[in-house]
Amino acid sequence: MDNRLLEILVCPLCKGKLEYDRAAQELICHADKLAYPIRDGIPVMLADEARQSVPGRVIDPAAPRTE
């Protein structure tokens, strides 16, 4: 995932910051508790494609943060 892209992407619902989960290939919105999939390197920023994220899930500390 390109760091420049991570800096500008926001949650489509709340416009909040997203956190990259490298292991799961997802962008996590902690405010809405949603995880947006990344498919073939492309973030799918559609609410219908998001899944409920797991509270307290540990995100890869080596992954770049956009917060």
From Swiss-Prot:
It holds the Pfam family Trm112p. InterPro entries: Trm112-like (IPR005651). GO terms for cellular component: cytosol. SUPFAM superfamilies: Trm112p-like. It comes from the Bacteria. Belongs to the UPF0434 family. This is UPF0434 protein Reut_A0592. It comes from Cupriavidus pinatubonensis (strain JMP 134 / LMG 1197).
